[in-house]
Amino acid sequence: MKGILGKKVGMTRVFKDDKAIPVTVIKAGPCVVVQKKTVETDGYNAIQIGFEEIPERKANKPLMGHFKKAQVKPLRYLREFRVENVDDYEIGQKIDVTIFSEGEKIDLIGNSKGRGYSGVMKRWNFRGGENTHGSKFHRGLGSTGMATFPSKVFKGKKMPGQYGNERVTIQNSEVVYIDVQNNLIAVKGGVPGARGGLVTIREAVKAKRPKTK
């Protein structure tokens, strides 16, 4: 499975065939292959790639040993991607946006914006209660566990709490255009997270592929 890491730049729009298409621009790569994992040593085939160089003082000793073994500069982010054949990659090899093409379907993984402690109307779209006619119930969640039966709160009950800052995957997004010179990739629609947030881009897992006879 091919993939790359990037950072969300922001949203804009492009025009194709007299249609305005909302796109999110991501600065993707270049990433560096830091480690290769094989079935013999690790039980599966994968490559570990790194993104965004950092000064040595910002990497701890175990990570510095990991980077020195691969003979690469310290990197802020490390992620794994399963591959069929690790021999197609070399330690220190650079991976850029050219692994994707315009019109291709991809999956985007990021952390959604954190919105803090939120009530049920904002977090779960509860309707709420009456605002007039003597009602004292406005934005509350209502009954949580009843009294005699079941006399408990069921697991998974929608209640107030931390909203956002969760791993979100957007599937089957379309690559609208690629700027190889500036390492930019524009995808149709929105991407989870704030500007500057880390985004993992991989080939679509559930993309429709032509049937083979």
UniProtKB/Swiss-Prot annotation:
According to its UniProt entry, one GO biological process term is: translation
Q: GO molecular function of the protein, one example?
A: structural constituent of ribosome
Q: Which UniProt keywords apply?
A: Ribonucleoprotein, Ribosomal protein, RNA-binding, rRNA-binding
* Gene3D superfamilies linked to this entry: 3.30.160.810, Translation factors
Specify whether Ribonucleoprotein is a keyword of the entry.
Answer: yes
Q: Does the keyword DNA damage apply?
A: no
Q: Which GO terms describe its cellular component?
A: cytosolic large ribosomal subunit
**Record-linked InterPro entries:** Ribosomal_uL3, Ribosomal_uL3_bac/org-type, Ribosomal_uL3_CS, Transl_B-barrel_sf
The UniProt similarity line reads: Belongs to the universal ribosomal protein uL3 family.
Subunit composition and interactions: Part of the 50S ribosomal subunit. Forms a cluster with proteins L14 and L19.
Query: Briefly, what is this protein's role?
Result: One of the primary rRNA binding proteins, it binds directly near the 3'-end of the 23S rRNA, where it nucleates assembly of the 50S subunit.
Instruction: State what protein this is by name.
Output: Large ribosomal subunit protein uL3
Q: What is the organism of origin for this protein?
A: Petrotoga mobilis (strain DSM 10674 / SJ95)
Taxonomically, what lineage is the organism?
A: Bacteria, Thermotogati, Thermotogota, Thermotogae, Petrotogales
